[in-house]
Amino acid sequence: MAGDDGVQSEIGKDGVLAHLLSPDSTRSRDEPEIATNIGVQLQHMGLKTWSISILRRLRDALGRLQPQSILEVGAGIGHRSAWIYDMFAIDGKHPAQYQLVEDGAKFAVILRRLMLRHDAESYTKIVVGNLDVLVGESNAWFAASSTGVEIGSPPLERNHDAIIVDGTSEQRARHVESLLPFLSTGGVLFTVEPDMPLGDIDESDTE
């Protein structure tokens, strides 16, 4: 992973995570224009996305990591992807591979438009389907290939330097576990904390 060795040698392994998630003062704090427009669409569609502050931290971390392979799960209509594509454009470089996974075919059409707008066909792969099924099919493919039998390619590649996981709180927990084997050595998986439970808290509850 480009940039990773330099980061670790400068600050030591214990400080890598804190360094990755710290704000990068050299980057704009404004939301990219395309991401802003997609954010308006999200509101009209009643969909949720990560907060601007989290998206900034993700972008800053990816900028430091300079991953050569990224897997984004739960890409939606591309709000987070627009931030990432904008970073590629500003930096003047992109990874060798950027896989976007989305369960809905209609959303995949929107993702394709975003990909074309950024001239990212050469390194972007949009995968449509249920992640649990895709992981199972990919694991089966890798098991078969280890015996010398290879037909086509797996739905999901392995050895990603960065994996981004979105979805409901329950989905995220399950998907994080199933996707850890798809990380490269030294790779980083990004997600958000579990959703806070709603409702009243019993006054006798001491937890």
Model region roles, listed by residue range:
Residues M1-S69, A96:
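Rossmann-like AdoMet
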Residues D5-V7, G136-A144, G199-D205:
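Short, flexible/disordered intra-domain loops and linkers
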Residues L47-E137:
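SAM cofactor-binding core of SAM-dependent methyltransferases
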Residues L47-W50, I163-S169:
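Short, flexible loop segments at the rims of nucleotide/cofactor-binding pockets, characterized by
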Residues I70, L100, I164, F190-T191:
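Generic enzyme active-site microenvironment
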Residues V73, D103, G167, V192-P194:
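Generic detector of well-ordered alpha-helical packing
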Residues N139-I163:
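A short acidic, Gly/Pro-enriched loop at the edge of an enzyme's catalytic core
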Residues G152-L156, A162, S169-E207:
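C-terminal substrate-binding/active-site "lid" region of AdoMet-derived donor-dependent transferases
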